Amino acid sequence: MNDNLKPADIVREEKAQLDFSRAMSYGDYLHLDAILGAQQPLSPAHDEMLFIIQHQTSELWMKLMLHELRAAIANVAQDELGSAFKKLARVSKIMEQLVHAWDVLATMTPPEYSAIRPYLASSSGFQSAQYRCIEFALGNKNAAMLKPHAHRPDLLALVTAAFEAPSLYDEALRLLARRGLSVPASHTERDWTQGYVENDAVESAWLTVYRDPKQYWDLYQLGEELTDLEDAFRLWRFRHVTTVERVIGFKRGTGGTGGVSYLRKMLDVVLFPEIWKLRTDL
């Protein structure tokens, strides 16, 4: 090994491909021209670039999250739990990534945000179609949340499909019923567009699983994957609240909500209630 090699010598020695006139390059594969050209600040403020990239990268992570969630829901519906577990674990890690992403936006100070806020008009993360699909896939159904997408038939179709489909938890309960556990028909054959209502019989079914993990190991693991997922989702929401409060205080959000007050209320939403309640009753 020659420790005196210069960088140019290393590239030559490794025979790295340098000519892409007739081959697909890294930028070609990733369509980087389109991605890196998508940041179009409207204000003269230096910090608007941070604001745009924060939200664009979050949307990319949410695209992957939806890709994994939809596949995981299909896996659970088909009793393919091994495949579902891998995807749900990945979703939890994506949420962890998004939690840390708030640390970057938190470097924006109130005066810096105030300089760009007038240029945002009524645009808001509240209107994110992908985030709404994630909430619907996790069971937080609310018909009013379709309205922000009514002006875009393509987006309306996307969120409506998620709204009308069984959620991850719906499919988990149907799986428990297929395995012979006593889950009421009111929770396995219901109107999927309605919000989930906590049920004692559902908790009893989960308690059966948690009292005998050895017999119901894969269902027990499913319960813990759901717990991990909601735990990660809560942290993501909480970090959103604290970042918004740090940057804008209690001003109303650009989307018309109360801002921090709205986000704090959303922290109280429980997605998989029986899995949390059984920990007290076990």
Swiss-Prot record:
Pathway recorded for this protein: Amino-acid degradation; L-tryptophan degradation via kynurenine pathway; L-kynurenine from L-tryptophan: step 1/2
Keyword Zinc-finger listed: no
Entry keyword set: Dioxygenase, Heme, Iron, Metal-binding, Oxidoreductase, Tryptophan catabolism
Comment on bound cofactor: Binds 1 heme group per subunit.
Coiled-coil stretches noted in the UniProt entry, renumbered to this chain: none
GO MF annotation list: heme binding; metal ion binding; tryptophan 2,3-dioxygenase activity
InterPro entries: Trp/Indoleamine_2_3_dOase-like (IPR037217), Trp_2-3-dOase_bac (IPR017485), Trp_2_3_dOase (IPR004981)
Pfam families in the record: Trp_dioxygenase
Catalysis performed (reactions): L-tryptophan + O2 = N-formyl-L-kynurenine
The keyword Metal-binding belongs to this UniProt entry's keyword annotation: yes
Cofactor list: heme
Organism superkingdom: Bacteria
Signal peptide: none
EC number: 1.13.11.11
Residues binding substrate: F51, I52, I53, Q54, H55, Y113, R117, T254
Example GO BP: L-tryptophan catabolic process to acetyl-CoA
Enzyme class: oxidoreductase
Binding locations of heme: H240
UniProt subunit comment: Homotetramer.
Family label: Belongs to the tryptophan 2,3-dioxygenase family.
Cited HAMAP family: T23O
Biological role stated in the UniProt entry: Heme-dependent dioxygenase that catalyzes the oxidative cleavage of the L-tryptophan (L-Trp) pyrrole ring and converts L-tryptophan to N-formyl-L-kynurenine. Catalyzes the oxidative cleavage of the indole moiety.
UniProt-recorded name of the protein: Tryptophan 2,3-dioxygenase
Classification lineage: Bacteria, Pseudomonadati, Pseudomonadota, Betaproteobacteria, Burkholderiales
Gene: kynA
